[in-house]
Amino acid sequence: MSNVGDKFELSRDEFRNITQCLGNEEFRKLFAEYCQELKDPENRKQYEEELKLMEAERGYDVKFIKPLPGYVIKTVVDGKTKAFVNVCHCDLVGKPSSQCSTNKRGEKGLKWSIPYAQSQPRKDYDNKNVDCVVYDVVFHYDTLHLTKSNKNFRKLVTDTALDAVEGAFHVSLDRVNLKFPKLQYKGVAKMTVIRQKLKNFETRRKDGLIDTLYRASEQSKITHDNSADKENVNKQTFKSASQLEYTTPAYKLIHRKEVEYHELTGELDAKLDAAIPKELVLVIELPLLKSANQCTLNVTSSEVHLISDSPAKYKLEVKLPYTVLEKNGSAKFNTDETTLTVLLPVARNRRTLNDVTVSSNDQSMPDEMDQKPVERVKPLKEPQLVHSNANKKIIFPKFSANKMDNIFAFTLNVRNVDPSSIELQKGTDTVSCRFTNIGNGFFPCYYIFFLRFPNANITEVQHEEWDNNIILQVVLDHGLIDCYYAGTNENDLVQYSIMEDITDKINKFGKEIEDDSLCIAVSKNAIKQERKSSHLSIEIKTKDEIESDEGIDSALEGELKTDQSMQEDENPDEINTRTVEDDTKVAKENVKKVDQETAHEGKKSKKNQRRKNKKRSLSESCCDHLKVTINNDNPKPESGNEANSFEGTGSSSEATSKQRKARSVSESCPARDNNGVESDSVDNLSALIQFNHKYKGILKRSSLQRSISECSSIDEHYYLGTSVDGSSVAESVDHTNGELSESCRKTVRFNDAIKTKLFRSNTSILGQKKKNAKKNESKRRALTRRLSEGESTDNEDKDHQTTNEAPGSVVQRDTEHDSGISLDSDAAHPIEINADTEVQNQHQNDSTKPIEINRKVEKKFIASKNNNCNVKAQFIKSKRNDSSDIEFKSDMIFDIEM
């Protein structure tokens, strides 16, 4: 081994190869045979003879030294590692010799010459499996024989062996704490080779190959000291070391300190004691001690003393760099590493700025200054120009400009400007501003802002300093300039335009470039121009949306014109006749529906249970922007004729019970005044047409999709010129309602009056259904009785109305059913009749105001709700020519204030 401290490292490939080879039986056999050959003495002799012949050819005499056991010396290498020195003997080593001599004092004695040989150190382990180092020093047998009879000679041999190890391998051995264990040899003996040059050797032709192979052997790690060449290295030093009674152990002193947050701040007293440690840590290495009881430790405020007599002699004195608190210290011995750790806190005296005193020399400084002669500075007779330093880098600041009449305001965006460094120089048409600021690296930056105004004279210049900028105000004699020049000096100017035309951008083809993706359209409906309270609306739309809106408006106007022409050509008498026939069919079908309700009572209860279990996907206000709300509480007539029409129907309004009704599109059709101008409901109507009747009433769950002719004749729908029957309309509405069934379903918005009358704040709507189940059953039975008993009453009322009407008017009669809904829609959905009629029937016995809207057609529509599908509707001829009716449909949404 070249180095004792080197660890034997085995790579993965080598470990894998060795494992595979040892797993092979043939390899194990061959390896066992090889080991047997090495142990065979005959083979060893043959190997030694061949090696001697080879070395003799090169002029060297080779001897194989086999160390025989003698005695062992135990010590410490460099104060850290245990070491064992084997003092061995061999007959091939030279015998000791002595001569009589006299020392410097004149005393006579013997001068001994002791030959020895030593091998390379090797690594081994002690009885505790701790690393140690083993050295072999081989003497002649006569040398060891003399040590047994003479103690002084034994000490001489021991010192010689230690000197040989220290001189050859440059280590330091502890000679004070030497031990001699009861061992004759440490470890396994290894053969050593001694090479000596032959004296009468004839020089032969050098073989380059042999010289190359044995070049390393010339620097053999095995050394042999002849008696003539034997000299002890640093002999005086070793003698002085042997005279010491104690060994100074190796130690290290550590300064330990914890960093506090307040020391990282920029305060003046933050780093007053930053260099003083918090505690001192003294680590002492004691490899020959087993516990702390074998040594004595004394600690003072400035020193540490350690002494040990048994089993090893150690003595240590350490002066501490800081004053410590000896009473607060602690010590700990580590048996594994055989180290003693002493922890001593440092006594710190916290100083403040007030503790700083002024020395006597500083106090005498003012007196000394007064005694010095004062040098007077003579003023210059002629002013001299001071040129700026050419090494200074001039920076042009970033700025922004504003103009108002003949006043210019320049904002120079520079921070931390020194106000004392601002210099302004005003010329006829030029302004120069110089200033400095402190940059991020705490170094000054120099700025120059130079201005020139062509065809203008500067009358006044002012400046204001702020934390983030400088405002430079320049006043000119006139404001008729279109540009100015700015830069660092007069030779480096850039032209800046005062006003740039941003909107007029012409491309290379000569066309104007505009971003028409978003425009502001100011529109005022032409239909509403004659209204008294016209409103101006501003909408922000894209270009595509404007084109689509124009197409919808043109289509809507065409439909309105077509319906108006159809109304003029249609005969009112024929329309009323068709309506009476339809109402007769409706009355017959209603009688059948009463019987069907009893048969499907079980199915209704199951359907109601399914409704309770339904969940809504969005909040109740997610589609408020899609609803149309019409308030008809107190209609204000715009002309006198309209007022008279409302007065004529006042009696019938009071007789009708106050009930809520979910009206259809036909019920809320726009009303026209005498001039033919539509009311505000035209906008709501166009919104409903665009959504294709997607939404139902807010108070009912009716799935009936009624056609145009269910509530009134075709001539009343002058705005809907179509011949589509109710079935096709129902299919289209079902398709559109299915698209929004999950997102916009059951969205309800009530006013304060309905909230206070119909709902309780501490319960939910589904909870109220369960509580009102019995009420719904009783109301359904009462409804059946009224249908059977109300035929004669309805006939008497209709006869009374016929006698009171003016001659020549057409009256629509309904003898069996008071609803204008076609029987087809009811028959198609017999099960969909809503059983939740508590909202409509809650005010059954109260009087309700009729909803009346005047139009050109001389008819009056009076509607009152008994339930969602049974609506009493009567068309009466009004006394006034300007009266009109309104059509109701189930998918309209209203807020009716009571």
Swiss-Prot record:
It is found in: Cytoplasm. PANTHER family: PIH1 DOMAIN-CONTAINING PROTEIN 1, PROTEIN KINTOUN. The keyword Cytoplasm applies. Residues 641-656 have a biased composition (Polar residues). It comes from the Eukaryota. Required for cytoplasmic pre-assembly of axonemal dyneins, thereby playing a central role in motility in cilia and flagella. Involved in pre-assembly of dynein arm complexes in the cytoplasm before intraflagellar transport loads them for the ciliary compartment. Pfam families: PIH1, PIH1_CS. One of its GO terms (biological process) is cilium-dependent cell motility. Keywords: Cytoplasm. It comes from Aedes aegypti. InterPro entries: Kintoun, PIH1/Kintoun_subfamily, PIH1_N, PIH1D1/2/3_CS-like. Residues 558-680, 765-822 are annotated as: Disordered. This is Protein kintoun. Residues 575-602 have a biased composition (Basic and acidic residues). GO terms for cellular component: cytoplasm. Residues 603-616 have a biased composition (Basic residues). Belongs to the PIH1 family. Kintoun subfamily.
